[in-house]
């Protein structure tokens, strides 16, 4: 476990306020362990927080702190073991869908015309992606493309017309295996014009709209709650957590985090497999 002092670091001895802390938690690689020998899609469906994490969330609630999920996952892919943590709300789809309690305060999607043109390019170049929206996910798998990127019970579409037929076209982002990236240049400039790519680790990336990320989502949630950055914390492990870190006062990287994420953090805790979330919360006197 590493510890680095920084301007954002708050210790138990230097609390400036007794107001409840607000803590934002990534899911994959932070609350839930991803094993390298298990396909990412299976972990999304079957991964569960450890008993230590469940108890830590109970203690946070007991102390009056507000815990939020802050994940690239859409609401459709947040399963009961995570929902049962009983959070105060969620920043989902990497900042596109924002919830306080059960109320959705913002839900943003890719323009349908833009999405159509991108999917036409993916179909032409045989690029396989997981299209993710708040309430629906579709594996776009053109003929001749890779069949690895799927989830149990996922809807599969082979053509743009099929995507229209099986969905409402309300998608906010898409995920893919990194070996698809060389094909993206042949798709055209629409991707670089409208999207940012984040490496999620384990050979998988996601693309989100340029003006939508976890940092945007956190700032909107804090604004809605009437709070500034004081006594706000974030736990994360991958590139899409960097905007999240910029939106809070104190950032905590997991011990299994990417090097760039550790470098950006005020504090590096233990790995997800060693209950690093629990260690970090204890370090800051939050539980």
Role assignments for model-derived ranges:
Residues 48-147:
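Active-site phosphate-binding/coordination module
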Residues 13-14, 18-22, 50-51, 206-287:
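Mg2+-dependent phosphoryl-transfer enzymes with acidic/Ser/Thr/Gly-rich catalytic loops
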Residues 87-95, 107-108, 149-151, 197-199, ...:
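Short hydrophobic/aromatic-enriched beta-strand-loop microsegments
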Residues 85-86, 94, 190-194, 247-248, ...:
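Short, structured coil segments at secondary-structure junctions
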Residues 125-247, 256:
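Conserved acidic, metal-coordinating active-site core of Asp-based
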Residues 35-59, 253-255:
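Basic, amphipathic juxtamembrane/active-site segments
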Residues 21-39:
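Asp-based phosphoryl-transfer active-site loop
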Residues 62-68, 86-88, 172-174, 230-232, ...:
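Short active-site oxyanion
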């Amino acid at each position: 476990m590493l510890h680095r002092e920084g301007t954002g670091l708050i210790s138990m001895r230097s609390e400036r306020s007794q107001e409840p802390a607000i803590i934002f938690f990534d899911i994959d690689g932070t609350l839930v362990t991803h094993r390298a020998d298990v396909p990412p899609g299976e972990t999304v469906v079957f991964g569960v927080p450890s008993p230590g994490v469940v108890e830590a969330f109970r203690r946070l609630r007991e102390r009056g702190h507000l815990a939020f999920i802050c994940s690239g996952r859409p609401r459709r892919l947040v399963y009961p073991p995570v929902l049962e943590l009983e959070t105060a709300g969620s920043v989902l789809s990497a900042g596109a869908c924002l919830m306080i309690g059960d109320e959705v305060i913002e839900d943003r999607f890719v323009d349908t015309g833009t999405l159509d043109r991108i999917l036409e390019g993916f179909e032409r170049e045989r690029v396989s992606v997981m299209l993710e929206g708040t309430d629906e996910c579709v594996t776009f798998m053109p003929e001749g493309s890779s069949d690895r990127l799927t989830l149990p019970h996922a809807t599969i579409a082979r053509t743009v017309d099929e995507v229209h037929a099986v969905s409402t076209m309300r998608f906010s982002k898409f995920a893919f295996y990194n070996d698809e990236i060389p094909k993206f240049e042949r798709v055209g400039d629409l991707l670089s014009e409208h999207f940012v790519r984040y490496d999620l680790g384990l050979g998988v990336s996601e693309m989100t709209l340029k003006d939508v990320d976890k940092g945007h989502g956190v700032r909107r949630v804090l604004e809605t709650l009437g709070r500034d950055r004081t006594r706000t914390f974030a736990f994360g492990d991958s590139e899409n957590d960097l905007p999240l870190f910029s939106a809070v006062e104190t950032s905590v990287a997991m011990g299994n985090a990417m090097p760039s994420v550790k470098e950006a953090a005020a504090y590096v805790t233990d790995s997800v497999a060693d209950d690093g979330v629990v260690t970090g919360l204890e370090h800051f006197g939050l539980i």
